[in-house]
Amino acid sequence: MDFISELKKRNIIKQISNEEKLALALKNQKGVYVGFDPSGESLHLGNLIPIIVLRYLKKVGFKTYAILGGATGLIGDPSGKTSERKVQDYEKITANANKIKVQLERYTQAKIINNIDFYQNMNLLNFLRDTGKLINIGYLLDKEFIRSRIENGISYAEFSYNIIQGHDFLHLYEQYDVQVQCGGSDQWGNITTGIDMIKRKYGEEKTPYLCGLTFNLLLNPNGNKFGKSEQGALYLDENLTHPYLIWQYIYNQDDQFIIDLIHRYVLDQSLEQLQELIEAHLANKKTRIAQKFLADYLVKFIHSQEHLDTVHKMNKALFDNQLDQLSDQEKLVVFASFDKVELDRNQSFMVIDFLLQAKVADSKRILRELIAQGSIQIDDLKITDPQAQLNVRKDQQLTVIKKGKKNYFIVVWKG
């Protein structure tokens, strides 16, 4: 199976400007690039599709490039936005780009270039003369993402973004023999601008490999962008998102959607190999074979086997009722999505008063009944005496209360 058919079968490709040129670009080992926006300090789970596809394209024979938007990030891409993006300062974009560069070096196996290098020594007059002349205003006004913003207002900076990204493609074409640009489905307008600028400068006959392709937007069954939990984006930086949260997010995806995710994310295994896994999953959905496979796969890919081992340890502690095996920090991660009550560690509590303030039940009568039934545990210890004094260590960050088999209540200690 050729690589285009492979990516289509996996539901990755949305649009290709010219399939014949794309096949020729591979045959002649031309360059392909994907751009990465440094508006945040880390890549997130949604960025993994272009990263994994870039790795795949290198494997099949393309020369691959990852372009950091150190220049374009200073303006902000208006694609898919209904209002003006907040401008970030140079220092912040530069710091973000440096952090993301480290991630791209780890994940992409591509040559990494910051597009700020294209513009630092360029003056405005040369840009308008050499690049601005390649595009007319009518062409830009026909772009859907610009047309949709005209009525509500769009700054000249964001209006010009399309030309600047087009110039990126032109520069890479001239300096690195990059013939293919890839991006999310919202990048189609920017990609085609670059193609048209290069064709206008060099002509159709001299651009036999020039093309672009976009990836299908990854939406969950509710129609929301995949890669965002209730707590926000799931970052690849473990200091921003603990690997356990990524594992849990993947593990909790529904049975049909997880199949689509496996097809898109696991490009280092053939569709035939993956089909065996999927059939085993469909034969016994309760075991969640597919969810566990992809959760393990992505945590190991993003982080390491050691991180995955820690995630497994945290899961085991939770399900085997051995939370004492975890540090307070690990407990905070495990219960990140749970509601929490803050209490003063310097305050003295009897167990029943503590449970009432932790909102385990609405009354002391109900709490006494639960304790008599053996249904209350505090930090893995079964409670038998509602009048006992609660002991809190000076360095203790939280207390975990378990009611019954599955209901948890979290108290965070302050003071």
Curated annotation (Swiss-Prot):
Record carries keyword Hydrolase: no
InterPro entries the record matches: aa-tRNA-synth_I_CS (IPR001412), aa-tRNA-synth_Ic (IPR002305), Rossmann-like_a/b/a_fold (IPR014729), S4_RNA-bd_sf (IPR036986), SYY-like_C (IPR054608), Tyr-tRNA-ligase (IPR002307), Tyr-tRNA-ligase_bac-type (IPR024088), Tyr-tRNA-ligase_bac_1 (IPR024107)
Residues spanned by motif 'HIGH' region: 38-47
Annotated EC: 6.1.1.1
GO MF, one example: tyrosine-tRNA ligase activity
Record localization: Cytoplasm
GO biological process: tyrosyl-tRNA aminoacylation
Pfam families for this protein: SYY_C-terminal, tRNA-synt_1b
Catalytic activity, reaction form: tRNA(Tyr) + L-tyrosine + ATP = L-tyrosyl-tRNA(Tyr) + AMP + diphosphate + H(+)
Residues bound to L-tyrosine: 33, 161, 165
GO (cellular component) term, any one: cytosol
Superkingdom of the source species: Bacteria
HAMAP family according to UniProt: Tyr_tRNA_synth_type1 (MF_02006)
Entry's family note: Belongs to the class-I aminoacyl-tRNA synthetase family. TyrS type 1 subfamily.
Its biological purpose: Catalyzes the attachment of tyrosine to tRNA(Tyr) in a two-step reaction: tyrosine is first activated by ATP to form Tyr-AMP and then transferred to the acceptor end of tRNA(Tyr).
Known partners and oligomeric status: Homodimer.
PANTHER family, A to Z: TYROSINE--TRNA LIGASE, MITOCHONDRIAL (PTHR11766:SF0), TYROSYL-TRNA SYNTHETASE (PTHR11766)
Name of the featured protein: Tyrosine--tRNA ligase
